[in-house]
Amino acid sequence: MKRVLAFDFGASSGRAILAEYDGGALSYREVHRFENCPRESEGHFRWDFSDLMANVRLGIEKAGAFDSIAFDTWGVDFGLLGEDGTLLGDPVHYRDGRTEGMTDEAFRTMNAGALYAATGSQIMPINTLFQLLAVKESDPETWSRAKRLLFMPDLFAHALCGADACETTIASTSQMLDARTGAWSRSVL
């Protein structure tokens, strides 16, 4: 029997679902449910990553043995890692106001039509591209210390097992992937 533990994170709650496949039928059950409570910290609205990871560990404990694990979260948000792989601060929530004015700032370098043509992504102020521009403009110390970016599902995997990868489907929410090649868009970056 194959057992997969999937974590589904929403804006205000999360849950751990254990799916089992016996070769003929698929079944699943919720093994853990928890609140997701973003908070104000360091002048920004942030995800409480330590609390979320504590709930991941609790969900793993409640699930028992499993063959694989997966994380499904909201798009656009990310964690920045330093040289040694540590998180440089709790990830900022997409509802934080730091991206106000960042689309106009970005359009000074690349107009909206060219940006859309390059990425195929709907242009929204919450997109990762504009969040990164906000970090660069308003927090140069963090910007200079950041060596890697991991989107939220990838950040959970990194915290759990040290994996460093940006999975393509979540990266597609960033406004930074080339729509034709699936690689990072050099013209956008």
What are these regions (language model features)?
Residues 1-89, 117, 145:
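N-terminal glycine/serine-rich phosphate-binding loop of ATP-dependent small-molecule kinases
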Residues 9-11, 116-189:
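Gly/Ser/Thr-rich active-site cleft segment
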Residues 32-34, 92-93, 170-171:
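Residue-level structural signal for beta-strand termini and adjacent loop
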Residues 39-43, 101-105, 176-178:
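Short, charged, surface-exposed secondary-structure boundary motifs
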Residues 46, 106-110:
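Short, surface-exposed amphipathic charged segments that create phosphate/polyanion-binding patches used
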Residues 52, 56, 99, 128:
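Conserved donor sugar-nucleotide recognition element shared by glycan-biosynthetic enzymes
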Residues 86, 101, 141-143:
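Short helix-loop capping/hinge motifs at secondary-structure junctions, enriched
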Residues 96:
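Carbohydrate-associated surface elements
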